[in-house]
Amino acid sequence: EVKLVESGGGLVQPGGSLRLSCATSGFTLSDFYMEWVRQTPGKRLEWIAASRNKVYDYTTEYSASVKGRFIVSRDTSQSILYLQMNALRAEDTAIYYCARDAYYGSYWYFDVWGAGTTVTVSS
Protein backbone atom coordinates (compact mmCIF):
# COMPACT_ATOMS: atom_id res chain seq x y z
CA GLU A 1 0.00 0.00 0.00
CA VAL A 2 1.34 3.41 -0.97
CA LYS A 3 1.17 5.83 1.95
CA LEU A 4 2.31 9.33 2.85
CA VAL A 5 2.16 10.47 6.48
CA GLU A 6 3.01 14.06 7.40
CA SER A 7 4.11 15.21 10.85
CA GLY A 8 5.87 18.10 12.54
CA GLY A 9 3.20 20.77 12.44
CA GLY A 10 2.28 22.92 15.40
CA LEU A 11 2.03 26.44 16.78
CA VAL A 12 5.02 28.70 16.19
CA GLN A 13 5.65 32.40 16.65
CA PRO A 14 6.30 34.69 13.68
CA GLY A 15 9.95 34.47 12.69
CA GLY A 16 10.23 30.93 14.02
CA SER A 17 11.06 27.66 12.31
CA LEU A 18 9.53 24.22 11.90
CA ARG A 19 10.56 21.09 10.06
CA LEU A 20 7.81 18.99 8.53
CA SER A 21 8.33 15.33 7.71
CA CYS A 22 6.55 13.13 5.21
CA ALA A 23 7.12 9.43 5.86
CA THR A 24 6.62 7.44 2.68
CA SER A 25 5.99 3.73 2.18
CA GLY A 26 4.95 1.32 -0.54
CA PHE A 27 7.19 2.80 -3.24
CA THR A 28 10.80 3.79 -3.88
CA LEU A 29 11.14 7.45 -2.93
CA SER A 30 14.15 8.06 -5.16
CA ASP A 31 12.12 7.22 -8.27
CA PHE A 32 9.51 9.94 -7.87
CA TYR A 33 9.10 13.68 -7.97
CA MET A 34 7.59 14.83 -4.68
CA GLU A 35 5.69 18.00 -3.83
CA TRP A 36 4.59 20.09 -0.89
CA VAL A 37 1.22 21.83 -1.13
CA ARG A 38 -0.66 23.83 1.47
CA GLN A 39 -4.28 24.74 2.10
CA THR A 40 -4.86 28.10 3.73
CA PRO A 41 -7.69 28.81 6.18
CA GLY A 42 -9.61 30.27 3.23
CA LYS A 43 -9.40 26.78 1.66
CA ARG A 44 -7.14 27.84 -1.20
CA LEU A 45 -4.65 25.19 -2.32
CA GLU A 46 -1.16 26.50 -3.05
CA TRP A 47 1.77 24.55 -4.45
CA ILE A 48 4.91 25.58 -2.58
CA ALA A 49 7.81 23.21 -3.30
CA ALA A 50 9.00 20.36 -5.49
CA SER A 51 11.81 17.84 -5.22
CA ARG A 52 12.68 16.08 -8.46
CA ASN A 53 13.75 12.44 -8.56
CA LYS A 54 17.19 10.82 -8.57
CA VAL A 55 17.50 11.12 -12.36
CA TYR A 56 17.42 14.91 -11.88
CA ASP A 57 19.68 14.86 -8.80
CA TYR A 58 16.81 15.73 -6.46
CA THR A 59 16.85 19.32 -7.66
CA THR A 60 14.26 21.61 -6.12
CA GLU A 61 11.85 24.36 -7.07
CA TYR A 62 9.84 26.78 -4.94
CA SER A 63 6.93 29.15 -5.21
CA ALA A 64 7.73 32.84 -4.92
CA SER A 65 5.90 32.98 -1.59
CA VAL A 66 8.36 30.64 0.16
CA LYS A 67 11.57 30.87 -1.89
CA GLY A 68 14.54 31.71 0.31
CA ARG A 69 12.69 30.68 3.48
CA PHE A 70 11.68 27.04 2.90
CA ILE A 71 13.94 24.13 1.95
CA VAL A 72 12.74 20.75 0.69
CA SER A 73 14.98 17.72 1.06
CA ARG A 74 14.73 13.97 1.31
CA ASP A 75 16.38 11.08 3.10
CA THR A 76 15.99 8.18 0.70
CA SER A 77 17.58 5.72 3.13
CA GLN A 78 14.68 6.33 5.52
CA SER A 79 12.10 7.15 2.84
CA ILE A 80 11.31 10.56 4.32
CA LEU A 81 10.65 13.88 2.60
CA TYR A 82 11.28 17.05 4.61
CA LEU A 83 10.21 20.66 4.50
CA GLN A 84 12.35 23.02 6.57
CA MET A 85 10.40 26.22 7.13
CA ASN A 86 12.23 29.32 8.37
CA ALA A 87 11.24 32.94 8.99
CA LEU A 88 7.63 31.88 9.31
CA ARG A 89 4.89 34.44 8.81
CA ALA A 90 1.22 34.59 9.77
CA GLU A 91 0.32 33.96 6.13
CA ASP A 92 2.12 30.59 6.29
CA THR A 93 -0.67 29.30 8.53
CA ALA A 94 -2.15 26.34 6.66
CA ILE A 95 -2.54 22.59 6.43
CA TYR A 96 0.58 21.22 4.73
CA TYR A 97 0.41 18.17 2.50
CA CYS A 98 3.04 16.13 0.73
CA ALA A 99 2.08 14.54 -2.56
CA ARG A 100 3.62 12.16 -5.06
CA ASP A 101 3.85 13.13 -8.71
CA ALA A 102 2.78 10.81 -11.49
CA TYR A 103 2.83 11.15 -15.26
CA TYR A 104 0.14 9.81 -17.56
CA GLY A 105 0.07 10.56 -21.25
CA SER A 106 1.04 14.21 -21.42
CA TYR A 107 -0.22 15.12 -17.94
CA TRP A 108 1.45 15.47 -14.58
CA TYR A 109 -0.78 15.00 -11.57
CA PHE A 110 -0.58 14.19 -7.85
CA ASP A 111 -1.64 10.56 -7.46
CA VAL A 112 -1.07 10.10 -3.72
CA TRP A 113 -1.61 12.61 -0.90
CA GLY A 114 -1.06 12.49 2.82
CA ALA A 115 -3.65 13.54 5.40
CA GLY A 116 -1.75 16.75 6.16
CA THR A 117 -0.24 18.46 9.19
CA THR A 118 -1.40 21.82 10.52
CA VAL A 119 0.93 24.78 10.97
CA THR A 120 -0.26 27.85 12.85
CA VAL A 121 1.92 30.95 12.96
CA SER A 122 0.75 33.30 15.68
CA SER A 123 2.09 35.28 18.61
UniProtKB/Swiss-Prot annotation:
Additional information: This chain was isolated from a myeloma protein that binds phosphorylcholine.
Residue ranges constituting the Ig-like domain according to the UniProt record: 1-114
GO molecular function per UniProt: antigen binding
GO biological-process terms attached to the record: immunoglobulin mediated immune response
Superkingdom of the source species: Eukaryota
PROSITE patterns cross-referenced by the UniProt entry: IG_LIKE
PANTHER family found in the cross-reference section: IMMUNOGLOBULIN HEAVY CHAIN
The protein's name in its UniProt record: Ig heavy chain V region HPCG13
Organism: Mus musculus (Mouse)
Entry GO terms, CC: extracellular region; immunoglobulin complex
Any single Pfam family the record assigns to this protein: V-set
Gene3D superfamilies documented for this protein: Immunoglobulins
Keywords: Adaptive immunity, Hybridoma, Immunity, Immunoglobulin
